[in-house]
Amino acid sequence: MKHGGVTKFSIQNLLGPIVILILLTHFVGGASTSLQLITQFALCLFVMVLALQVFVGNSGVLSFGHGAFALIGSYTSAILTAPVNIKDNALAMNQLWEPLVSPQVNVYVSLVISAVVSGLVAGITGSLLMRLNGLAAGIATFALLGVAYNVFFNNKEIGPGSQALPGVPWITNTWILLLLAV
């Protein structure tokens, strides 16, 4: 709600979607394995849509940067959680940069590290790109997304390139994903 040009926080606007998510997670996510997987993907998409809405809705500037930052975070998490023997022996990973081969952490530690890495990249690029507005901002952030895509999918020194990275563990608990989404 807006009062005099200032957005007023309403707890009902926040708790409504959270209660719906909790109920959907409880009833749909626990029904079967396939519905649990669909619920987990829906929670991931919910976070992406919410990230887009928070920025575009508040600033009015179209931005594709959140896709690039999610890409950076997911690749960071995948490289950190993949088993060392898979990174050593996988066909696409034989050119992997040496400091990326040896580290292996659990999923939750990798989420924190990947959030920090993508946050740093967002801070650096955001300080440059947020001086733009209108169509220029949309084009520049779309270019950032294109650069991130091409770097990660064509450079085999920092990841598997266009091939899949096997052995990355899943978070199988839908309640943990709900907590991360909220």
What are these regions (language model features)?
Residues 1-182:
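Transmembrane alpha-helices and adjacent helix-loop boundaries
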